[in-house]
Amino acid sequence: MSTNENANLPAARLNRFKNKGKDSTEMRRRRIEVNVELRKAKKDEQMLKRRNVSSFPDDATSPLQENRNNQGTVNWSVEDIVKGINSNNLESQLQATQAARKLLSREKQPPIDNIIRAGLIPKFVSFLGKTDCSPIQFESAWALTNIASGTSEQTKAVVDGGAIPAFISLLASPHAHISEQAVWALGNIAGDGSAFRDLVIKHGAIDPLLALLAVPDLSTLACGYLRNLTWTLSNLCRNKNPAPPLDAVEQILPTLVRLLHHNDPEVLADSCWAISYLTDGPNERIEMVVKKGVVPQLVKLLGATELPIVTPALRAIGNIVTGTDEQTQKVIDAGALAVFPSLLTNPKTNIQKEATWTMSNITAGRQDQIQQVVNHGLVPFLVGVLSKADFKTQKEAAWAITNYTSGGTVEQIVYLVHCGIIEPLMNLLSAKDTKIIQVILDAISNIFQAAEKLGETEKLSIMIEECGGLDKIEALQRHENESVYKASLNLIEKYFSVEEEEDQNVVPETTSEGFAFQVQDGAPGTFNF
């Protein structure tokens, strides 16, 4: 990038670029940057909160003998429920609580607000402590879980009712189905956001939750129970501003690493989501995870056949390579690049986009890391993405290419041109996205600088002209954005200007593979552009 070109670019944007000698971290793009469109699905694929609408197998065998009074609890009104709960008769309270639970477990429009307005939450919370009557503990826990699965306002009503410490006490219940319901409820509360997550942690939920997983063999736990525990732990790792407390993360990580080696697909998916949340932050947070040695297992899961596992594993790997060159190297050393041909051609648009975003942060690394990208044959895949992927993915590819041309050697840039980057790069200049036009103009400028070192700018100009690129660059001189029109003007004046002294005899020698560019200093060999 030439000095006068630099002058045209907003400082904030320049800071994201690495010129030779600039720290590569400036080029890495995290999800939190404001002026780069977030490379994120509209919503995380992982559920924030979950409602329990299933019938528990324990119902039939619980001391409740539900079938005995099934008819009695099906069509209760909220008024009937209030009456039953406010009675001093335990049997009536139990029936009323069960009726409330059934209403709240309705698939369509459960009357959560009516139940809250009726003032039933404090009653349900008090029932959680009735150790002498496990059925009412279970029914009230289930009812509260479903209230907490609603809006933030509804979750707040459960928290304000004092449910957090009551649920934490229930984690140690001798009845597995009650303990599991408490796990689920705490997951819903923590999933609401940072404030409630930290409240759950502050009330001391982590120790008893981890104690439930402290068994020699995880496969001795019931599958649903283990899935619920993993999901709740992942919600304790979730959300930013602020991120979870560091000591909590340190405490949870060893168990997460263990879960990451389990064989159940849902447990693996939620463990990967947890790791993806923990790596979505500054380098110190990434380091906490990387030093636990999880990268090889994440890379293994990156090659899984199940999309629900691949999605968060890729997100976690993508987050790790936003870190330092050393953290990125851990990902490369674990063999991640071998999985990228399939990720970059994945039929799921979102996987392609995240994989390309990840590549853009790897090409922002050192020259030996760019060389690994070359050695793994990934450049043709990036050219393919730039040529024909969904537009959001093409944008990520443009970043990947610009980062590559900013930090790569002349040889690496020549190889990029040889792989056919010029035409798809030029085609994207017609996009209506100013940011991406700026990124592409930077790439073109970087490629020209490499050509200058070889005395090959004329031949590069011809290539650009032949694929219609010159017309596009000329049109950008009338662009409304100042840095776009100045950068395009700069390219035209420097490399396409008629006033420039021209040697009419310079025509690129055509080979079967395209234009052959001679190295100016007489170095052996020909660079095929």
Swiss-Prot record:
Ranges spanned by the short sequence motif Nuclear localization signal, renumbered to the chain: 45-54
Post-translational modification remark: Ubiquitinated. Deubiquitinated by USP22; leading to stabilization and increased activity.
Location of region: NLS binding site (major): 142-238
IBB domain boundaries: 2-60
Modification type Phosphoserine: residues: 62
Domain-related comment: Consists of an N-terminal hydrophilic region, a hydrophobic central region composed of 10 repeats, and a short hydrophilic C-terminus. The N-terminal hydrophilic region contains the importin beta binding domain (IBB domain), which is sufficient for binding importin beta and essential for nuclear protein import.
Family label: Belongs to the importin alpha family.
Protein name (record): Importin subunit alpha-1
